[in-house]
Amino acid sequence: MAYPMQLGLQDATSPIMEELMNFHDHTLMIVFLISSLVLYLISLMLTTKLIHTNTMDAQEVETIWTILPAIILVLIALPSLRILYMMDEINNPVLTVKTMGHQWYWSYEYTDYEDLCFDSYMIPTNELKPGELRLLEVDNRVILPIELPIRMLISSEDVLHSWAVPSLGLKTDAIPGRLNQATVTSNRPGIFYGQCSEICGSNHSFMPIVLEMIPLKFFENWSSSMT
């Protein structure tokens, strides 16, 4: 989760988030090199006395500034397309969870189990226990097994919402009448927080998401107790 005064991204918990962080560093390095080159050329123009007022064309320069940006775009596009494919591809999910956005709460249905569904509301500030996080705790957490591919089917009952958990690299729009999907795979157990990331009305800020990732054995015990 995020901390006060934190700089940078949240710690990666899923393979997709690890890839996104690597891509962020890769792209940031390219941007840094381009910015350094541009600043160097600007400083050179301001300090040098060499001018070329009679130059009408420069084929070599035009070729370079056409080919070089194309190469840079390819270097950015290829890893980006690879990650997009990874985020969209779901191979043999062991579990499917249907997520519905409402004003202003989430409802979850474990489609592989009978009668395993619940609503998830934010816990009001005056009902929080010591150590719980303001505006982030819910009455019913989403319990999921770790190290297994899980498919989330995401939609909405009313207006646009967005189901987002930054540590897992997840952000999927919840659109009325449309079913979007996302892959959840956690590398380690823990509790991970997210929020609705699409302005959906006056209580948009009060739609937290809490995932509790646990080993498969404990998940089976929990699901048995819930059904």
Swiss-Prot record:
Its EC number is 7.1.1.9. Component of the cytochrome c oxidase, the last enzyme in the mitochondrial electron transport chain which drives oxidative phosphorylation. The respiratory chain contains 3 multisubunit complexes succinate dehydrogenase (complex II, CII), ubiquinol-cytochrome c oxidoreductase (cytochrome b-c1 complex, complex III, CIII) and cytochrome c oxidase (complex IV, CIV), that cooperate to transfer electrons derived from NADH and succinate to molecular oxygen, creating an electrochemical gradient over the inner membrane that drives transmembrane transport and the ATP synthase. Mg(2+) binds at E198. Cu cation A1 binds at H161, C196, C200, M207. It is a multi-pass membrane protein. It catalyses: 4 Fe(II)-[cytochrome c] + O2 + 8 H(+)(in) = 4 Fe(III)-[cytochrome c] + 2 H2O + 4 H(+)(out). The lineage of its organism: Eukaryota, Metazoa, Chordata, Craniata, Vertebrata. One of its GO terms (cellular component) is mitochondrial inner membrane. It is an enzyme of class 7 (translocase). It comes from Desmodillus auricularis. This is Cytochrome c oxidase subunit 2. The chain crosses the membrane at residues 15-45, 60-87. InterPro entries: CcO_II, CcO_II-like_C, CcO_II_C, Copper_CuA, Cupredoxin, Cyt_c_oxidase_su2, Cyt_c_oxidase_su2_TM_dom, Cyt_c_oxidase_su2_TM_sf. Residues 46-59 are mitochondrial matrix. PROSITE patterns: COX2 (PS00078), COX2_CUA (PS50857), COX2_TM (PS50999). NCBIfam families: CoxB. Cu cation A2 binds at C196, E198, C200, H204. Residues 1-14, 88-227 are mitochondrial intermembrane. Component of the cytochrome c oxidase (complex IV, CIV), a multisubunit enzyme composed of 14 subunits. The complex is composed of a catalytic core of 3 subunits MT-CO1, MT-CO2 and MT-CO3, encoded in the mitochondrial DNA, and 11 supernumerary subunits COX4I, COX5A, COX5B, COX6A, COX6B, COX6C, COX7A, COX7B, COX7C, COX8 and NDUFA4, which are encoded in the nuclear genome. The keyword Acetylation does not apply. Keywords: Copper, Electron transport, Magnesium, Membrane, Metal-binding, Mitochondrion, Mitochondrion inner membrane, Respiratory chain, Translocase, Transmembrane, Transmembrane helix, Transport.
